[in-house]
């Protein structure tokens, strides 16, 4: 089995221009994010800085995120929007791909049993 077959829903990412309580800055993509663990429906809000290198669907469209065992295996064969990178000082590795016209984030947590947020 590959990383996709072991995927588990993690959150939905929604683009916003409004500041939200508890935002954390992700330097690699220059975006402020909220913890979906603090939202009753696991929504993560993303607020991009004007100088963010992120463009296109990843910056403009919502995404659905899944936990996978192997992010490299999960992205194989997909149109990669943003290749794997670390967030939270090694808390997890993430990558973004297009799947049938929608943005999908694959997340490989350093600790697969992790329930928190970086």
Where are these regions (language model features)?
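Eukaryotic phosphotyrosine signaling hubs
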Residues: 60-62
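Core segments of cupin and vicinal oxygen chelate
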Residues: 1-50, 54, 73-100
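A short local loop/turn or secondary-structure capping micro-motif enriched for an aromatic residue
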Residues: 52-54, 65, 112-116
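A generic structural micro-feature
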Residues: 56-58
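Short hydrophobic/aromatic beta-strand micro-patches
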Residues: 15, 65-69
